[in-house]
């Protein structure tokens, strides 16, 4: 097993994370470096369970402006797709404001609706007392686009590019990233686990080798660049995730 431990913000005054500098306050509910990253391979029993829980051929319905997303259209140009039903149905949006207005009324859990309402009410400059300095775009704190209680995956590093977003349910759910049309398989590059408890697992399905999995801790944890997370068979976890358990 490979275990890569990352410093928590409570332990240090400031920390540099993959080109992103975080100067945190000491509030317990503010985001910071992930508490720990664990990458390993699944046992045959675990692998069978994960594969049985998702079927990539069973496509998720995705909607944008009231119409089903064309699988050939790359989300019809939308930037954000959010799970809005326990059956996996996704709604896609052009902006965070548009998404949060919808989610404040229609998200599948009270916690998710509350998170969207908080995001709408928050002032952009004061959403969190954390200063982020990102390459080429120092003024934007992109991780804040992910509302409270949600799990978010971005297509690019530093919380940029297209984003998939899932609410927190009473029990964990597993989704195959190939269920989305078009697929988000092998595209994830950064993540924010914006909740205090229950981490997230990412899986890479392999042929002829045990499937690697990556555990990302909870606790409002930021993972800005998967290229810096070691992959079991060499290289990094960037553009490797095939499924997510959230």
Model segments located where?
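Compact beta-sheet-dominated domain cores in extracellular/mature segments
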Residues: 2-8, 28-246
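Hydrophobic helical h-region of N-terminal Sec-dependent signal peptides
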Residues: 8-16
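C-terminal segment of classical bacterial N-terminal signal peptides
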Residues: 17-25
């Amino acid at each position: 097993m490979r275990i890569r431990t990352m410093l928590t913000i409570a332990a240090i005054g400031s920390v540099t994370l993959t080109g992103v500098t975080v100067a945190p306050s000491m509030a317990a509910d503010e985001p910071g470096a992930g508490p720990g990253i664990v990458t390993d391979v699944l046992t045959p029993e675990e692998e069978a369970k994960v594969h049985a829980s998702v079927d990539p051929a069973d496509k998720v319905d995705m909607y944008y402006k009231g119409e089903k997303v064309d699988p050939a259209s790359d989300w019809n140009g939308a930037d954000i797709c959010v799970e809005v039903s326990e059956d996996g149905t996704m709604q896609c949006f052009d902006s965070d404001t548009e998404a949060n207005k919808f989610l404040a009324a229609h998200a599948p859990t009270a916690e998710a609706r509350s998170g969207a309402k908080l995001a709408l009410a928050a002032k952009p400059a004061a959403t969190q007392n954390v200063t982020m300095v990102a390459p080429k775009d120092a003024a934007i704190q992109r991780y804040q686009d992910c509302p409270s209680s949600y799990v978010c995956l971005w297509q690019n590093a530093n919380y940029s590019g297209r984003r998939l977003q899932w609410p927190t349910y009473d029990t964990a759910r597993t989704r195959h990233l190939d269920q989305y049309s078009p697929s988000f398989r092998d595209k994830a590059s950064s993540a924010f686990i914006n909740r205090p408890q229950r981490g997230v697992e990412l899986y890479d399905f392999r042929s002829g080798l045990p499937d690697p999995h990556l555990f990302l801790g909870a606790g409002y944890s930021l993972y800005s660049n998967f290229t810096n997370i070691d992959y079991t068979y060499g290289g990094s976890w960037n553009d490797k995730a095939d499924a997510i358990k959230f």
